[in-house]
């Protein structure tokens, strides 16, 4: 549900830094590459259809090299459970037939097509059934929902991460930590990212890379030069003030859990004392527009000193949903009103985090311009 783009980008960079030149398709732009997709290096070698050729295909035969095929050495794809098309309501990821599948976390989302969490868990079960016996499933040991999925059936090697009893664990702070593989030191990550969520993303990527042949120590070392993904706490600009610069960030968070994780990560990175955190968010996804998770918004915004919600296009009352936050929350019916509210409240040293899964009406640039005026 969360961390798909970042974890996919981490894994892709690990493979790239270790000479594999992978192909990839990512739902964001990894800063290390500057593009969201490429084919990767083609390699000719022995027939790689170890689990049998894809449906509708037959393994090549005939000629002087009857088992030679041309294939991508490694291809990393970001996959999710959203439906394939209006005429195919199966989740997109059941079509991919992965050799290595990373299950990072799972909670209810996409209320426009799923009735409940159990319906999503069934789709994840279908995904696991497509992984061959020679494949690997990498799963977050902290997620009860994923445990339920695994108990429905597992026919491949399993590697877990995150929990104290998992195969891959971390010791240390999210920005600098040791990686343990079954309790033994396996590498160290020191990087510019923050947040426990990114620490978990790193463990998932390291466990997946190991299945492709990259040693955990080499994978951890590669993450030191990982530059994150655009729109993941991306600094869009700063405005200088005598009392401290105001920083404006852009983040893709739109689910309550993602909002909370993003703000908690920033709070942890800033430490204490720190400038205030101002959360500016747009409930734009289909799930949020339906109001399915509106009651979770005050919880998701606990780390914010002030919160500003864009209520345009909503069928529910954002003011009522945010009432438990009292004076800490304001609601703007349009972008102009929202910008005015944020600028009026902003102080030197503030950190303004803009969160939406869309363009948010160019609010980042408009805030920077208004703050500098």
What are these regions (language model features)?
Residues 1-139, 145-156, 203:
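Phosphate-binding loop of NTP-binding sites
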Residues 22, 185-189:
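Short beta-strand segments
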Residues 29-33, 144-145, 166, 228, ...:
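Short acidic loop-to-helix transition motifs that present clustered carboxylates
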Residues 46-50, 55-69, 99-100, 125, ...:
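ATP-dependent carboxylate-amine ligase
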Residues 76-78, 189, 247-253:
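Active-site-proximal beta-strand elements of phosphoester/diester hydrolases
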Residues 91, 189-195:
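A short glycine-threonine-serine/GTX helix/turn-capping micro-motif
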Residues 141-145, 163-164, 312-315:
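Short, polar loop motifs at secondary-structure junctions
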Residues 178-180:
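A general beta-strand register signal
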């Amino acid at each position: 549900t969360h961390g798909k783009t970042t974890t996919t980008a981490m894994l892709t960079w690990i493979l790239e830094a270790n000479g594999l030149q992978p192909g990839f398709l990512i739902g964001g732009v990894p800063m290390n590459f500057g593009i969201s997709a490429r084919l990767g290096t083609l390699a000719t070698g022995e027939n790689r259809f170890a689990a049998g050729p894809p449906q509708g295909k037959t393994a090549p035969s005939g000629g002087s090299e009857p088992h030679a095929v041309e294939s991508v050495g490694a291809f990393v794809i970001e996959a999710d459970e959203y439906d394939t098309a209006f005429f195919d309501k199966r989740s997109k990821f059941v079509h991919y037939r992965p050799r290595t599948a990373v299950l990072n976390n799972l909670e209810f989302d996409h209320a426009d097509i799923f009735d409940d969490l159990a319906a999503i868990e069934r789709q994840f079960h279908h995904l696991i059934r497509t992984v061959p016996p020679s494949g690997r499933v990498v799963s977050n040991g902290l997620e009860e929902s994923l445990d339920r999925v695994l108990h429905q059936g597992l026919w491949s090697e399993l590697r877990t991460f995150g929990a104290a009893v998992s195969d891959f664990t971390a010791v240390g702070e999210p920005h600098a930590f040791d990686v343990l593989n079954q309790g033994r030191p396996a590498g160290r990550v020191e990087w510019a990212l923050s947040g426990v969520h990114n620490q978990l993303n790193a463990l998932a990527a390291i466990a997946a890379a190991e299945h492709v042949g990259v040693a955990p120590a080499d994978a951890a070392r590669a993450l030191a030069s990982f530059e994150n993904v655009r729109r993941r706490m991306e600094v869009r600009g700063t405005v200088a003030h005598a009392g401290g610069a105001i920083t404006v960030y852009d983040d893709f968070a739109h689910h309550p859990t993602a909002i909370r994780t993003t703000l908690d990560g920033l709070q942890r990175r800033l430490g204490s004392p720190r400038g205030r955190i101002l959360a500016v968010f747009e409930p734009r996804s289909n799930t949020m527009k339906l109001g399915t998770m509106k009651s979770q918004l005050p919880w998701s915004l606990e780390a914010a000193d002030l919160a500003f919600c864009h209520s345009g296009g909503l069928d529910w009352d954002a003011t009522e949903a945010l009432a438990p936050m009292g004076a800490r929350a304001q609601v703007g019916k349009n972008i102009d009103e929202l910008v005015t509210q944020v600028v009026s409240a902003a102080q030197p040293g503030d950190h303004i985090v803009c969160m939406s899964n869309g363009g948010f009406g160019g609010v980042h640039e408009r805030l920077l311009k208004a703050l500098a005026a």
